[in-house]
């Protein structure tokens, strides 16, 4: 039984899908005007884990994450670079796939784009106007916020409280300061589309509502995104979607916490803005992912090199213990009476599932993984090992790896199994037999230069990535 924290109700709830065995999930994606920063990477990783765990529990997950390819930031970037908005969007969509692919984020079921849904957006807005929920004014179209009775229910703010901070900017023609834009009148030199309201382009909030409706229907199971999107973006999505669809927009709302850099808010003005495109050249993407899930998704996370190094060390411990188990598999036998280890492994797996069932607590799931590694390290020191126990260890390691999306071997691990490396190890073994220790040391140093560390053990030579 999976429970998750629902921002809408401010409490944990048992997950009950609309359709048995299926999860319809919409995650707000990036505005594709630049490479993604690590703040964008966090929801991509966290909700990828949520998806993976649902799939592990037997659900079919329809995972939709959009690209915002029409936006003020894109238009500004196109003017700066003297390139078209579609050209810039294509470049950074490709970069996004490359970056999150490096972080082992699975491809979405669908990645809808605003430009591909322009006719749908225009019709959606027209429907809202026809029903009295929206109005045209000065070439713009606004949503009539006070007409929607549930406005403020996600952010838990009354409409009167919201009114206090609202204002009408110069050039806006709103009936009420709380009303928000559905359609923006075209400005000279900006990309625009023809519509019944005149030339223009959609507002940000309406884009997600329409893409979610088109891809997943009037009501979805889970809508997710960063905490910064809770208001006004997700609040406005609810208002326009439920006014249009006459149905709840999403049954569960999930929001991940912020990322700070050395205990400061990440911002360009502070010079601590970290792009994934840059950081994965310095930090192993697997380590970055492991670091991101080492904290519960709803909690803020502090990024600094010391904490990343701690994550690297922790992941290395897990991988080294798995390598030891793989090596012992070569000499394991079918001995019996090792039920104690089987029971302990099962207990760790049960604990992993328990904490993941409790609002996807990856921090505690990693603790369970450490405990599995500790038990594995103890087991390989036994005089005799059982094939059954070894296989059980390997199976549970693989479950943890698949659910958390962290590979059991580094992306360079295949190099350790390369035919040339194996031949060098064999040659070194032969040199030692022949007492040619100079050659044996030479081969050892050669492999070390490739980050391959050899260790002589009673069970033979084993190697690991340094």
Curated annotation (Swiss-Prot):
The record, for InterPro entries, names: Cys-tRNA-ligase, Cys-tRNA-synt_Ia_DALR, Cys-tRNA/MSH_ligase, CysS_C, Rossmann-like_a/b/a_fold, tRNA-synt_1_cat_dom, tRNAsynth_Ia_anticodon-bd
In terms of one coarse class, where is the protein primarily found?
cytoplasm
**Cofactor binding mode and count:** Binds 1 zinc ion per subunit.
* Location(s), subcellular: Cytoplasm
Q: Does the UniProt entry include the keyword Ligase? A: yes
User: What cellular component GO annotations does this protein have?
Assistant: cytosol
Q: Please, one GO biological process term?
A: cysteinyl-tRNA aminoacylation
Q: Does the keyword Cytoplasm apply?
A: yes
Binding, ATP: 268
Task: Give the matching Pfam families.
Answer: CysS_C, DALR_2, tRNA-synt_1e
| SMART domains in the cross-refs | DALR_2
Supply the HAMAP family for this chain.
Cys_tRNA_synth
**Keywords attached to this entry:** Aminoacyl-tRNA synthetase, ATP-binding, Cytoplasm, Ligase, Metal-binding, Nucleotide-binding, Protein biosynthesis, Zinc
- What is the protein name stated in its UniProt record? Cysteine--tRNA ligase
Enzyme Commission no: 6.1.1.16
Chain positions of motif 'HIGH' region:
30-40
- Reactions that this protein is recorded to catalyse: tRNA(Cys) + L-cysteine + ATP = L-cysteinyl-tRNA(Cys) + AMP + diphosphate
Enumerate the GO terms in the molecular function aspect.
Answer: ATP binding; cysteine-tRNA ligase activity; zinc ion binding
Which of this chain's residues are annotated to bind Zn(2+)? 28, 208, 233, 237
Sequence similarity? Belongs to the class-I aminoacyl-tRNA synthetase family.
Please list the cofactors this protein needs: Zn(2+)
Describe its assembly: Monomer.
Instruction: Pinpoint motif 'KMSKS' region by residue range.
Output: 265-269
């Amino acid at each position: 039984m999976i429970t998750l924290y629902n921002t809408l109700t401010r409490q944990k709830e048992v997950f009950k899908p609309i359709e048995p065995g299926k999860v319809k999930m919409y995650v707000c994606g990036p505005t594709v005007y630049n490479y993604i920063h690590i703040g964008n990477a966090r929801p991509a990783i966290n909700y990828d884990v949520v998806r993976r765990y649902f799939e592990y529990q037997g659900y079919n997950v329809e995972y939709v994450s959009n690209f915002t390819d029409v936006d003020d930031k894109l238009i500004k970037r196109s003017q700066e670079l003297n390139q078209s908005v579609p050209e810039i969007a294509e470049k950074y969509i490709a970069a996004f796939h490359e970056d999150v692919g490096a972080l082992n984020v699975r491809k979405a079921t669908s990645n809808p784009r605003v430009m591909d849904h322009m006719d749908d957006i225009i019709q959606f807005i027209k429907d809202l106007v026809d029903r009295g929920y929206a109005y045209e004014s000065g070439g713009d179209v606004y949503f009539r916020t006070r007409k929607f009775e549930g406005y403020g229910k996600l952010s838990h703010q009354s409409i009167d409280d919201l009114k206090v901070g609202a204002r009408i900017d110069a050039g806006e023609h709103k009936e009420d300061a709380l009303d928000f834009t559905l359609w923006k009148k075209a400005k000279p030199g900006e990309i625009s589309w023809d519509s019944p309201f005149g030339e223009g382009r959609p507002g940000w909030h309406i884009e997600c509502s329409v893409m979610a409706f088109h891809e997943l229907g009037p009501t979805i199971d889970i809508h997710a995104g960063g905490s910064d999107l809770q208001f006004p973006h997700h609040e406005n999505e609810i208002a326009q979607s439920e006014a249009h669809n006459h149905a709840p927009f999403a049954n569960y709302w999930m929001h991940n916490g912020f990322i700070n850099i050395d205990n400061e808010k990440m911002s360009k003005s502070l010079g601590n803005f970290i792009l994934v495109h840059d950081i994965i050249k310095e930090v192993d993407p697997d380590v970055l992912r492991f670091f991101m899930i080492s904290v519960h998704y709803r909690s803020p996370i502090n990024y600094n090199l010391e904490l990343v190094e701690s994550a690297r060390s922790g992941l290395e411990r897990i991988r080294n213990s798995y390598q030891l188990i793989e090596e012992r598999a070569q000499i394991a036998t079918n001995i019996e009476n090792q039920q104690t280890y089987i029971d302990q492994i099962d207990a760790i797996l049960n604990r992993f599932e328990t904490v993941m069932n409790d609002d996807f607590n990856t921090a505690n799931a990693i603790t369970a993984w450490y405990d599995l590694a500790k038990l594995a390290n103890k087991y390989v020191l036994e005089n005799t090992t059982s094939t059954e126990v070894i296989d059980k260890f390997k199976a549970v390691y693989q479950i943890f790896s698949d659910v958390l999306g962290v590979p059991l071997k580094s992306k360079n691990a295949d190099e350790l199994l390369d035919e040339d490396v194996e031949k060098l190890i064999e040659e070194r073994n032969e040199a030692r037999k022949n007492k040619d220790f100079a050659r044996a040391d030479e081969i050892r140093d050669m492999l070390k230069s490739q980050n391959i560390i050899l260790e002589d053990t009673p069970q033979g030579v084993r190697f690991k990535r340094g």
